[in-house]
UniProtKB/Swiss-Prot annotation:
Originating organism: Saccharomyces cerevisiae (strain YJM789) (Baker's yeast)
Gene Ontology MF terms: phosphatidylinositol-3-phosphate binding
Protein name according to UniProt: Autophagy-related protein 20
Recorded family membership: Belongs to the sorting nexin family.
Binding site for a 1,2-diacyl-sn-glycero-3-phospho-(1D-myo-inositol-3-phosphate): 192, 194, 218, 267
Length: 640
């Protein structure tokens, strides 16, 4: 009877094994296995199923209870990164990746190193695969919980902008332009270069104290070909990107030559960086302008801008807007003067003579000189010589390829001499291999070193534009001071003349009141040599009356009293303008000096550090590969 029970029990266990996929435990042991009942959340309550083994004689059939978790954990998936151990039911419910896992490609653990497959230090899957909870950039203002509200740093990691393709679009009448297909989250939109220009122009007017990232300069293919070294050269596009831009993901749907391709990829890189940097700016993302730019419903960006009352009401010049809120520009701001080049030179001379705002001006003068020198070192130093080095390596690659072909032909001619032909073949293969390695190196230097350096130069230019904006506001303030001092001097002079005229009129009125006849004889001059004759004063009065009649015939001249009133109004307006510009200048100076420029410096340090790391890695890998190639040649020569 016991054997029959064992058979039935084994059959039951086999049936459970087929249903659950668990192996049958060996005889002679007893244990409890907790089977996970997967619920909607991926975690179920354990269901105990006793499994009894065959117990030997003399045993008391005591059951040893042992709870074994069989739920599929994150560590059991070979495509998931290793998670924490020691899970409990409550801990499993708190794992962020348990609800919806995003498979991770194991190939992404390694970069294209051509030889060694060096592992990358990538971020955790939970961080890199986090998706945005809303399609709107300013969704942070919505009613979302604190745990679900994505921060700017999280959006930077999870929501990246990519330009998927660049294609030629015809406008008709033989005209065409390059359109860029932008992907953000789950939507795509098509924009042209002039749309990016318009967006940046609006951002500069909306955020005059913020460093707006640069976009590539507008130039024709011909001009761009002249501005780059080796414009006719073709460079191999690297399989790995640099920074946040991977050019291998962008496709050019057009028949273009080498110069066109480099210009388009240059624009793709800088425009992608431009949009991604805007996404990380907390001040800009509080508005909806980036959302509007990436909205597929806004097919024509220029029509959208023209139809917006906010954009159309912005002042044309950032020098005539309220820097704290350009959409709320006051009447005083709109009437502020705009300094020109001549006034700048004049005011610089006067300011240096009078030593006005010496400390503040000196501080920003030093900052401007430092940033100008920084930009010059990047543009005419590192960037310039790296372009030259890239061209040299490109020419060397061509020479290696040609000399490899020559050695191959020579080996074919010396086929009857087996040993010599073999040595020539090894040399041919070595030069060909070095040429291939150089081609990869040149492509990486051009796209992943020179292009980021060029972007750094443009960023330095944008920083200097911000410093220049502060300088123009300073000159504007000096212009108002100069104009105010001039108006005050005019008012004092006019009041002095009015007082003199009043004295003359008073003397004439006094003489007329004494007698109806006017004594034209010279009165006794007892007032000293500086006194004026009575006749002279009288004739001055007649001349004044005659000039008034004459002027009334030709044109109506403003009388001194009215001119004095107008001057007082102008002085009042200039005083208000001076107060506004001084307050603006103080705010602008603090924001630029204490916020924007330090932030720019930190970002540039990080970017340049990454560029230098890439540079040393590329050169090291090429040197290692080239060394192995020539070591192989030496081994063959030693055994020959």
């Amino acid at each position: 009877m016991s054997d029959l029970n064992d058979v039935q029990e084994n059959a039951k266990l086999n049936s459970e094994t087929r249903n659950t996929g668990k192996a049958e435990p060996p005889h002679g042991t007893t244990e409890y296995v907790a089977e996970a009942e997967i619920s909607k959340n991926g975690v179920g309550s354990p269901k105990k199923s006793p499994k009894k083994g065959k117990v030997g004689k003399g045993d008391n059939n005591k059951v040893e209870t042992e709870l074994v978790h069989t739920a599929l954990l994150e560590k059991d998936n070979p495509f998931m990164e290793e998670g924490p151990t020691g899970f409990t039911k409550s801990a499993l419910l708190e794992i962020p990746g348990m609800r919806s896992h995003k498979l991770k490609n194991p190939n992404e653990d390694y970069e294209d190193d051509s030889e060694g497959l060096l592992p990358l230090n990538q971020e955790s899957n939970a961080e890199t695969c986090r998706t945005s909870l809303s399609g709107s950039i300013n969704s942070m203002n919505g009613e979302t919980s604190a745990s679900e509200e994505p921060s700017v740093s999280n959006r930077k990691k999870s929501a990246r902008i990519h330009i998927l393709e660049a294609k030629r679009v015809s406008e008709g009448q033989g005209r065409a332009y390059i359109a860029y297909v932008i992907q953000f989250e789950n939507s795509t939109v098509q924009r042209r270069y002039s749309d990016f220009e318009s967006l940046r122009s609006i951002l500069i007017r909306l955020f005059p104290m913020t460093l707006i990232p640069p976009i590539p300069e507008k130039q024709s293919i011909k001009n761009y070909g002249k501005s780059i070294t080796g414009s006719s050269s073709k460079y191999l596009l690297p399989s790995e990107g640099s920074g946040s831009v991977d050019l291998s993901l962008s496709v050019i749907h057009a028949s273009v030559n080498n110069s066109d391709e480099k210009l388009i990829r240059h624009r793709i890189r800088m425009l992608t960086e431009f949009l991604n940097k805007l996404l990380t700016n907390e001040e800009i993302t509080k508005t909806s302008i980036i959302t509007d730019f990436l909205d597929p419903n806004n097919h024509n960006w220029h029509e959208f801008v023209n139809s917006s009352s906010t954009f159309s009401s912005l002042p044309k010049s950032i020098l005539q807007c309220n820097p704290l809120d350009p959409t709320n520009t006051t009447r005083i701001h709109a009437m502020l003067p705009i300094p020109g080049s001549s006034s700048q030179l004049l005011l610089n001379k006067e300011s240096s003579d009078k030593k006005m705002d010496k400390e503040r001006s000196k501080s920003f003068t030093n900052i401007e000189q430092d940033y100008k020198q920084y930009e010059n070192l990047l543009d005419n130093g590192i960037y310039k010589y790296n372009r030259r080095t890239t061209k040299t390596y490109h020419d060397l690659k061509s020479d290696y390829n040609e000399i490899g072909e020559v050695f191959a032909q020579f080996a074919h001619e010396q086929a009857q001499v087996g040993e010599l032909a073999e040595q020539l073949s090894y040399l041919s293969n070595a030069f060909s291999g070095s040429s291939i390695s150089l081609e990869k190196l040149v492509g990486r230097l051009y796209y992943n070193i020179n292009e980021p350096l060029n972007e750094s130069v443009h960023m330095a230019t944008s920083a200097r534009e911000l410093i220049k904006y502060r300088k123009l506001k300073y000159l504007q303030n000096e212009m108002i001071k100069k104009s105010l001092n001039s108006k005050r001097a005019q008012l004092e002079k006019l009041e002095a003349q009015n007082n003199e005229y009043k004295d003359v009129d008073k003397i004439i009125d006094n003489e007329m009141s004494k007698s109806h006849t006017i004594n034209l004889e010279r009165p006794n001059n007892n007032t000293g040599s500086g006194g004026k004759s009575y006749g002279g004063k009288l004739f001055n009065g007649f001349n004044k009356l005659a000039s008034m009649v004459k002027d009334s015939v030709k044109y109506q001249e403003t009388d001194p009293h009215t001119a004095s009133i107008n001057l007082k109004k102008e002085i009042e307006q200039l005083s208000e303008s001076l107060e506004v510009t001084e307050n603006d200048l103080e705010v602008i100076s603090k924001v630029i000096k204490n916020d924007q420029l330090p932030k720019f410096s930190k970002e540039r340090e990080v970017d340049l550090s990454e560029i230098l790391k890439h540079y040393s890695r590329y050169m090291r890998n090429y040197a290692r590969q080239n060394l192995e190639i020539w070591k192989e040649v030496k081994r063959h020569q030693d055994f020959a």
